[in-house]
């Protein structure tokens, strides 16, 4: 299941990565703050739609264990960075298949977040409890949680079918993230962070 989703979304994934600040830019206060603000606004629109999609409870995935929006909110507060004034419209996530596809994007970002965390923690003085909660993700359990997500998606598709609809949901979420990051003002320079003491 995960390889099929990776293949279906490869082009969008590459374009999103190209739009995001580089690792070196993220290790600078303004770049890190801008990325947090952009991701916070995206999750604020997409997470509620994913978790409230009709039939999503049947996936067995637990919202309280996987929501990233509270982590992003905590990071912004800890670093004294205001959320973006720009907002995304609520997306249309019509069913569990589309929600699984979108969650593939949101959960997959956790893997990349671990790489970012290791690169920026020292230069920025962030920790999992001060400004780095989102990028720290599930910590040492990140790989295990990713595999568990993949197994839940595979199991759901084996019962309900609709692998093509899951892939379409992932493509839709990636396309929305791509469009959001390309929106003027979304990744503009943010106020500098207060370095951890």
Question: Which residues fall in each region the model found?
Answer:
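Metal- and O2-centered redox machinery and metal/ROS homeostasis
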Residues: 1-197
């Amino acid at each position: 299941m995960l390889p099929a989703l990776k293949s279906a979304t490869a082009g969008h994934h590459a374009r999103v990565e190209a739009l995001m600040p580089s690792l070196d830019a993220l290790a600078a206060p303004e770049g890190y703050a801008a990325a947090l603000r952009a991701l916070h606004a995206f999750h604020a629109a997409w997470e509620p739609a994913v978790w409230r999609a009709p039939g999503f409870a049947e996936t067995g995935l637990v919202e309280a264990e996987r929501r990233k929006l509270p982590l992003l909110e905590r990071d912004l507060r800890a670093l004294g960075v205001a959320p973006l004034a720009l907002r995304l419209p609520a997306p249309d996530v019509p069913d569990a298949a589309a929600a699984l596809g979108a969650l593939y994007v949101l959960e997959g970002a956790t893997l990349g977040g671990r790489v970012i965390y290791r690169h920026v923690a020292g230069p920025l003085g962030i920790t999992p409890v001060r400004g780095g909660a989102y990028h720290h993700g599930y910590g040492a359990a990140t790989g295990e949680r990713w595999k568990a997500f993949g197994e839940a998606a595979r199991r759901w598709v084996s019962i309900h079918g609709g692998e093509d609809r899951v892939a379409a949901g992932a493509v839709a979420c990636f396309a929305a993230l791509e469009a959001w990051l390309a929106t003027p003002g979304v990744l503009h320079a943010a106020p500098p962070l207060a370095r951890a003491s």
